[in-house]
Amino acid sequence: MTEELEGDEPGGDTDSDGTANLQEHESPLAEQEKSSGKDAKANAATNLGMAVLKAIAPLDLPTISPALLGIGQTAADIFGALDLPKLTPGIFGAATSSIITLMTAASLARSRPSDFETVEEPPTSYSSRLSSPGDYFADQEAIVESMEDLNQVIRRLTDKAQLVPLVWRGQQNADWALHSSLFRELAALKGVVPPQDNPVGVQPYPSEDDMVAAERAILRVARESWRFSQLTAMETIARLQHQGAPTRLLDVTRNPYIAAWFAVEASDEHDESDARLFALGTAPVPKTPEAESANTAYAALSTALTQSFEPFWHALDTTAKRQQLDWGTGSNRLVWVPPEYDPRIAAQNAAFVLDGVPMFTQRVSRYFKASDGHSWTKADLLASASIYARMYSTTRRPPANGASIAPSFSIRIRSSAKLEIRRMLERWFGYSRASIYPDFGGLSQHIKHAFRDIVAAGP
């Protein structure tokens, strides 16, 4: 449970139903109304955070589902009520710190501390089994050779994985890695050679510290040189992602057929290549009903944490802190649905997956083996994905695992099926470049891609 806050009496008042009584903590709000400017907001943020912590201290939160859900709402309310995106970084950092402490106190981490007590594995070379990321994903992949196959695989997978919330991502080439653009750019800067080039020797893939340092530099430029200083960290990063700048975000959709459209999208360069459709679990398979309730509460808290001016994960500067919030453990993938400031977001049912670079230790690595027992190296896994991606079969119900790693699923779409699937998606759902990219950027790309056909069709 939570530590006693300095100056606070142990425990706290609760009502007869076991919920926290927050009446005695209303004074910070009253004081805020009497004050003015950023100092008042700073005091309110700090006092409210402490009030919430004190109120929940007596509760055995991991066993009380309503309390867990209430904490998520409280966290969101704190951020919403104080108009926090307009606060200075220092003030917002204090409020964010309070919420991080709240999450830690609630003991919501799904991963086991013992799995990350050992020193993280050093960089490694590729194993002989990996000639491309596609080799890693192929071990458990489903094969789609027609629209009928696609329907069956999606229906079977969503039925088998009912207890796991899924998001979807389509990629035009089955041999591409599941990498964020920031991870990919940093890997190139650090001199990583992809497995397709058959390199010999250790591969220095980016660490979480590398990612954080790059993000800090990018945010500094955005706020100091371009003066985008009033946006939250997540909104800044999301807008940069939309404009093609490198970020740690992975574009996903909550609609499997939209993801399939991205996988089979017409492309002179990739039409002859197999495509890949990913289904990413955002939480582990729950081991108990209580764990399933915790998944819901964790999602609510995750939403609140994405509202900070500074990225909350920048404060997680040790392995222990990252494990406490399941950052880079594979046990939690934050899914952020951005505001609909862009027409593509609604059209694509879009969201972003957010997670830390995997923390590979010897104890965790044992969960990453091929179906024939082959052990994948750290380089193999990072060459394949910038987040934990433990693959499962689409034909069986995914079991819970000791490390509480969220499941991932892979579907290979044969190149010969791309045209049929593309035509059926347009006929059944109206998916086309015009509907998926309903803006001038999409129009420009379409004209560039289909210029000859457009001119040939005439006015």
Label every model-predicted segment.
Residues 2-9, 26-33, 39-459:
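Catalytic-core elements of nucleic-acid end-processing and repair enzymes
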Residues 12-25:
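Extracellular calcium-associated, cysteine-rich motifs in secreted modular proteins
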